[in-house]
Amino acid sequence: MKTNFLVKPLGLLVALVLGISSCKPPKPVPESEYAAKIVGNWLGEVGHMNESMTLNGDGSFIARLRPRGFISNTLSQGATGTIRGMWTINGKTITLRITSAEDEHVKDRVTSSTILAFNQDELSLKSDHDETSTFSRTLSP
């Protein structure tokens, strides 16, 4: 009986310690690893658009933009625009060179953003137009 009395609190203590240790914030990606670790699928909001972005290991990217709002979200009336191009990272700056755009008006063919924060699952960027956007890593585009 006494052993059982001690096992339960000990088990709860172990569960509590494991739970607290798993609540640590994710470690930031070192700047020297940005180009390798940024490869993958990302989802975020840019202005009034939902944006999914795939950054490939060969330096190519594809971004899909869809307007947000009642009509777009409920009746699927919003057209999804697609932008393709190449990306590079130099220090904390990611540069996108656009090679094609479908159903999307592109002002500039080259744009750069500063990486404000980057961990395994989240990426915060500040555009050269001074807008901040946060993207979350996803499993699929």
Model-predicted regions and their roles:
Residues 23-141:
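Lipid interaction determinants
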Residues 1-21:
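Sec-dependent bacterial lipoprotein signal peptides
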